[in-house]
């Protein structure tokens, strides 16, 4: 056997000859012969698209409304923040602020560890402005603090107990802009009752005086001088009593005393009745009558 025959046998064993006269070995045609990964080999001629390796990225967890509304999100803050963020008088302002900030940093890291605290707050702020669920959750918290319940949250409370304020009876004892029966004191109700009784008595006296005005006779012009003098003197005495009573009432009001009682109201109504009767009768003394009264006073 010649050398050429031996070379032909080797070429047949090792591989096939290419068009340019070079030899390609069998392990180059089949990389798996030597245990190589097919994706690690490079071919000069056209590559099969199915053999292209792509780097797959892990899915990135985003901060969503569902994550913020989960048990580790905002409900956790609403439950534990009042206990963990208490301000102590025995600590300095720096220590209280540090404790306050540390609570929210730990909460943010447990909820979304991929972001820094500053970035987390920015994400929460932007998400809270755009997401409808977070806005509704925030409005429900505000309504709960104000004691306002809407929709299915309203219990079976009679309409009479709700009054006109729309506030539940449990929240009516709190400070409110609306005045209820419980907020008015007993003194105010008593003063209002006295004022009502005084107005009622005076109105009844006016009705009596109006009825008496229609019963006057035409013989009033023929009264004696003694009657005129008596009526004029009585008118002056009545005016003095009215002025004295008015002064006393003003002094009592300025000193913070209560309104007049029932007896004082009766006396005041009698004085008002006499004064109105005298004025309605037009029993005003003339110049001659006043002169006669002065003469009587001199005796």
From Swiss-Prot:
Q: What is this protein called?
A: Chromosome segregation in meiosis protein 3
Source organism of this protein record: Kluyveromyces lactis (strain ATCC 8585 / CBS 2359 / DSM 70799 / NBRC 1267 / NRRL Y-1140 / WM37) (Yeast)
Which InterPro entries does this UniProt record tie to the protein?
A: Csm3, TIPIN/Csm3/Swi3
Task: Name a GO molecular-function annotation.
Answer: DNA binding
Which residue ranges have biased composition labelled Polar residues? 39-54
Q: Which residues form the signal peptide?
A: none
Q: Which domain of life is it from?
A: Eukaryota
The UniProt entry's GO CC annotations, sorted and at most eight, read: replication fork protection complex
**Subunit:** Component of the fork protection complex (FPC) consisting of TOF1 and CSM3.
Stretches for region Disordered: 34-54, 205-246
């Amino acid at each position: 056997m010649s050398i050429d025959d031996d070379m032909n046998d080797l070429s047949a064993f090792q591989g096939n000859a290419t068009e340019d006269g070079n030899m390609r070995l069998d392990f180059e045609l089949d990389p798996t012969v030597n245990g190589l990964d097919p994706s690690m080999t490079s071919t000069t001629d056209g590559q099969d698209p199915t053999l292209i390796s792509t780097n797959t990225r892990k899915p990135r967890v985003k901060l969503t409304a569902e994550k913020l509304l989960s048990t580790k999100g905002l409900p956790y803050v609403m439950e534990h923040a009042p206990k963990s963020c208490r301000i102590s008088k025995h600590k300095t302002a720096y220590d209280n602020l540090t404790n306050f900030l540390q609570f929210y940093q730990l909460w943010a890291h447990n909820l979304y560890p991929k972001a820094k605290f500053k970035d987390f707050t920015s994400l929460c702020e932007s998400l809270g402005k755009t997401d409808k669920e977070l806005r509704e959750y925030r409005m429900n918290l505000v309504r709960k603090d104000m004691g306002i319940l809407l929709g299915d949250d309203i219990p079976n409370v009679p309409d009479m107990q709700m009054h006109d304020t729309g506030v539940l009876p449990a929240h009516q004892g709190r400070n409110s802009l609306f005045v209820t029966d419980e907020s008015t004191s007993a003194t105010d109700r008593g003063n209002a009752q006295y004022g009502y009784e005084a107005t009622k008595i005076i109105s009844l006296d006016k009705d009596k005086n109006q009825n008496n005005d229609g019963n006057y006779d035409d013989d009033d012009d023929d009264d004696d001088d003694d009657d005129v003098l008596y009526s004029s003197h009585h008118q002056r005495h009545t005016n003095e009593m009215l002025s004295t009573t008015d002064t006393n009432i003003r002094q009592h009001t300025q000193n913070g005393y209560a309104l007049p009682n029932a007896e004082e109201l009766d006396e005041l109504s009698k004085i008002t009745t006499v004064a109105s009767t005298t004025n309605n009768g037009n029993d005003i003394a003339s110049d001659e009558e006043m002169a006669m009264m002065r003469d009587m006073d001199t005796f």
